[in-house]
Amino acid sequence: MGQEKNMMDSLQLDYRIVDTFEDLQRVAEGFETQRSVAVDLEADSMYHFQERVCLIQMASRNLSVVIDPLKIGDLSPLRSVFENPRIQKIFHGADYDVRSLYRDFSFNINQMFDTQVACRFLGIRQTGLDAVLQERFGIRLDKKYQKKDWSRRPLPPEMIEYAAKDVLYLHPLSKILQAELKEKNRLSWVQEECQSLSRVRPAENGGAPLFLRFKGAGRLNRRHLAILEALLQFRRHIAETLDRPLFKVIGNHALMRIAVEKPASLKDLEDSRALSPGQFRMYGRGIVEAVCRALTAPDAELPVYPRTKTAPVSPEIALRVKALKSRIENLAESLKLDASVLCPRALIGTIATANPVNIRSLKALPDLKNWQRKTFGHEIVTVLNDLKGKNKR
C-alpha cells in the first residue's frame, strides 16, 4: 500500500464552484483537452416528488469543479465531454448516475470506466467506494451528508466540500484498478461491461398500473388490487402536489394494510390504525373515497395482475443448466471471482435453452458478451456436446 498511499498524499482538495453558463462553457472546453474525467453527482430523491440532479462533480488531473445545474439550467456545454469517445469518464457505481444524467439532460455517455465494476472483476467483495478507498488507501469517507437535501440553496460549504471529495480519489483508484485488470487480462472484460452499462436508461411507466411496481401486489385478489391501485394513484397525486417523495406521504406497508382491510368509512380507517394521526388528519377523507370507488367498481372493470406463463423446464434443459452451472463455478473459483460476475444464472438458463452446438451458435445469443464467449465459449460448447454424447449412448 506504500506506493498507493504516497499517490493519495499528493492529492489536494482544490476545487471551484461553477454556477453560470459562461463558466460552464470554459470548464467544458478545459475538459475537452483531457484524456479522462472523473464524475459523480448528488440528487434529491429523498426530498422531492420528481428527483433531480442537484450537483455534478467533475475532475480531471488538474481541474476539479462542482457544477450547480439548478442555477445554470442549460448544461449543453457538457454534452461534448460526456459523448466524446476520446475522453474516459470515470464513475464509481455508474448505474444510477447514467440514468439520472440521461433523464435530466439527455446525456449519452461514451467511453466510461466504472471502478465498482472493475472491483467486482478483480474479485473484491466489498465494492462500495468507502470500503474500497479504506482497503486501498486507508481513507474513510465521511457519509454524514449523503442523505441531506442537495436541492437547498445556498448549500453550506461543508456539503460542497463533501461532494467534491468523492471524485478526488477516482483518478488514482482507476489507474491502479486498470493496471491490475490489464495484468490479469480482464481489462477488455470490464470495458465491455462498462459499454453496456453506459446504455442503461430510466424506467418508464408508460401509463401502466402502479401496482405492477408494488411488492406483494401479485398476492391480492382483483378487488383488493383495485383498492391498492386507487390508493397508489391517490398517493401519487398528493406527492406531486406537495412535491414530496412517495414514502414521505404514506408508506407502502400502510397502503397494503388499507387495501386488505378496505375501510369504507373514516371510523373504519381510524380503527385500523394504519395511518399516523397526522396522516389520518391530512389524507383520511381522500383515502376513504379512493377505497369506496374501488369497492363499487363493476367486477368487469377490476384489474388483473398479469401472470407470466413460463413453460416447464424440460429434464434435458435442467441437466444442461446443472452441468453449465458446475463448470462456471469451477472456472470462477479458479479465477477467484464470484460465479455471478462471470455468468449470471439467468444467462446460464438462456444458454441451456438455446443449446448452442458451436462457437458460431454462441454468437447468436445477444445476452452473451464477447468477452464471455472468448473466455469460456469453448467450455460451454464442450459441456453441452458432452451431454449430447452421453444422451445418445
What kind of feature is each model-predicted range?
Residues 1-37, 41:
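N-terminal accessory regions of nucleic-acid-interacting proteins
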Residues 10, 17, 57, 62-171, ...:
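Active-site-proximal helix-loop-helix substrate-binding element of RNase H-like nuclease domains
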Residues 38, 47, 54-58:
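Non-catalytic, usually N-terminal nucleic-acid engagement modules in DNA/RNA processing proteins
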Residues 42-46, 274-276:
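Short beta-turn/strand-loop junction motif enriched in small, turn-promoting residues
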Residues 50-52, 355:
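A short, glycine/Asx- and small/polar-enriched loop/turn
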